[in-house]
Every structure is written in structure tokens, then in C-alpha cells.
């Protein structure tokens, strides 16, 4: 009798755990709004409430076969930083996001490697950044957009495969496995880029501050299988701007632990390097 009770308790505990895991892994439901060919948008509730704002995740889904991607950088265009709407309006882009974090000592330079065709914004790989956004393929047999995992793919083997690169910190590796960040208690507004096993590209923005590890868990709860994700920017610099015939959407961050602990930012900041998207 005692054995049966122990067995029953163990069974129920295991069933509860499996049910909880299943719910966590598919807890985000997304309904896409088509903005233009190959570009979709959705605002969804994050699985966890934030300390500030609406706890929403703003997600752009992109079919890379139907759009063109561009790196636009101040170092290539008049040495002048611009807001996301200014970048979009000047260069005719439907979507603009940060291309990565910039170097605080060289404010026009990406912190990691960045190249756009013959223009090198930063020619040096950042040692601890294991992710690389790549697009504008040199060979038509290559995918139009990739997130390369430099911990699994040697840089020398892929550095001439594409014409446009931007290096950043990995959040999920090429096998879909989460990475743990050491800054466990740092909260910030956040922008990141992800790709799924079908090749769709996702830009994910949150005005509400979360830790990096919380955001990684949110990515794993998406209803698509992510095979790579990179952190792009946080705080008031984090920018997402969408301007299509059907809709205009403006998203900018605010909160960063210790350096900007408020939700008061009410405008886009000027940023030096962006990724632009326009329909072919």
C-alpha cells in the first residue's frame, strides 16, 4: 500500500512537470498581421509581467525571399547618426532596427565586426561575440539571410560567403539551445533578432524591461523553432520602426538597470548603424 502511494505520488508529480513544461514551451500564441509582401507583425503578451509598462513583445516576421536587407551606417553615409525614422525615410526602407551595439569609445563603430560590401565599419571580430547576422549572399545557392554561430562554424570558412555582416552576442545557438548570461539581474528594454528552422527572420522588441535570461526563455516559448538568436541593443537606443502602406509602428526602449532606470523615454534616439528592410 505504501509502495502504491509513493508510485502514485511520483506519477502525478512527473505528469504535472511534463504538463508544465509543455505549456511553457508553447505558451505564446501569435496572430500575424500582414503589413506588406513578406512582412508581418504581432504584439503579444510576454509570459511574465514586467516591473514596468505593458509587458508586450512586439514581433516582426520576415520572409527573406520576398525582401531586401541593407546595412546602413553613419560611417558610410556622411558620418551622421540618425533616428530610425530618419534612416527609413532617407533610404526608402519599410523596417529599421539597430544593427548592433555601438562602441562607446568610437560612437559610429559597431562593437563587433561589421561589413557592408566594400565598406568596413569595424574590421575586428569581438572575441566574446559568437553570433553573426549575414545577408546579401555572394552565391545564389546560399540562403538570403543567416544567423551564423561562430562557435560551431569557423569564421574563415564563411567570411566571404556574404557581402553584409553584423556581429553580436548569441542568445540561442545554432542547435536551438539557450545560452546563460552572467548579468542575471540586469533589466533593460531589449531588441533582438532570431531565425527559425524554416528560414523566417524575426525582430523581437520589448519596451518593458526583462533580464536577458528571461528573454531567452520567452524565445523558447515561441510557436516556431528558433535555430539562432542575437541580442542587438537595449535601453533607450533600442529602436524598431515600421512604415508600410498598411501601417506605421514606432517602438523605442527606455529602461536599463543602473544607468537609465526609468520608463520616461518618449522619442527615438539617434543611432549609428541599422538594418533596413524593403520589399523587392
Regions found by a protein language model. Give the residues of each.
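Generic structural signal for short, solvent-exposed loop/turn connectors between secondary structure elements
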Residues: 16, 21-23, 92, 107, ...
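Active-site beta-strand/loop microenvironment that shapes enzyme catalytic pockets
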Residues: 91, 117-278
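Solvent-exposed coil/turn segments that connect beta secondary-structure elements
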Residues: 65, 101, 198, 278-280
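Generic cytosolic/nucleocytoplasmic N-terminal low-complexity/intrinsically disordered segments
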Residues: 3-4, 18, 33, 47-48, ...
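Bacterial Sec-dependent N-terminal signal peptides
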Residues: 1-25
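Zymogen propeptides
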Residues: 23-126, 204
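Short, glycine/serine-rich, charged loops/turns that create anion-binding
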Residues: 13, 100-101, 208
Amino acid at each position: 500500500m505504501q509502495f502504491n502511494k509513493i508510485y502514485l505520488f511520483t506519477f502525478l508529480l512527473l505528469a504535472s512537470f511534463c504538463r508544465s513544461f509543455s505549456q511553457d514551451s508553447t505558451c505564446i500564441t501569435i496572430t500575424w498581421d500582414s503589413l506588406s509582401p513578406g512582412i508581418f507583425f504581432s504584439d503579444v503578451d510576454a509570459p511574465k509581467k514586467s516591473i514596468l509598462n505593458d509587458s508586450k513583445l512586439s514581433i516582426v516576421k520576415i520572409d527573406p525571399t520576398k525582401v531586401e536587407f541593407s546595412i546602413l551606417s553613419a560611417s558610410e553615409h556622411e558620418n551622421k547618426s540618425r533616428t530610425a525614422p530618419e534612416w527609413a525615410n532617407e533610404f526608402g526602407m519599410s523596417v529599421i532596427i539597430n544593427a548592433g551595439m555601438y562602441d562607446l569609445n568610437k560612437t559610429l563603430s559597431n562593437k563587433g565586426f561589421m561589413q557592408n560590401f566594400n565598406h568596413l565599419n569595424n574590421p575586428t571580430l569581438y572575441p566574446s561575440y559568437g553570433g553573426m547576422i549575414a545577408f546579401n549572399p555572394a552565391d545564389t545557392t546560399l540562403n538570403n539571410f543567416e544567423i551564423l554561430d561562430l562557435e560551431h562554424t569557423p569564421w574563415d570558412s564563411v567570411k566571404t560567403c556574404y557581402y553584409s555582416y553584423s556581429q553580436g552576442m548569441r542568445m540561442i545557438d545554432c542547435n536551438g539551445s539557450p545560452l546563460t548570461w552572467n548579468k542575471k539581474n540586469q533589466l533593460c528594454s531589449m531588441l533582438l533578432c532570431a531565425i527559425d528552422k524554416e528560414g523566417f527572420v524575426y525582430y523581437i522588441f520589448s519596451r518593458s524591461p526583462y533580464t536577458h535570461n528571461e528573454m531567452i526563455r520567452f524565445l523558447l516559448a515561441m510557436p516556431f523553432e528558433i535555430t539562432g538568436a542575437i541580442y542587438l541593443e537595449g535601453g533607450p537606443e533600442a529602436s524598431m520602426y515600421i512604415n508600410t502602406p498598411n501601417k506605421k509602428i514606432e517602438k523605442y526602449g527606455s529602461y536599463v538597470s543602473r544607468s537609465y532606470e526609468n520608463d520616461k523615454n518618449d522619442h527615438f534616439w539617434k543611432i549609428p548603424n541599422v538594418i533596413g528592410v524593403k520589399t523587392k
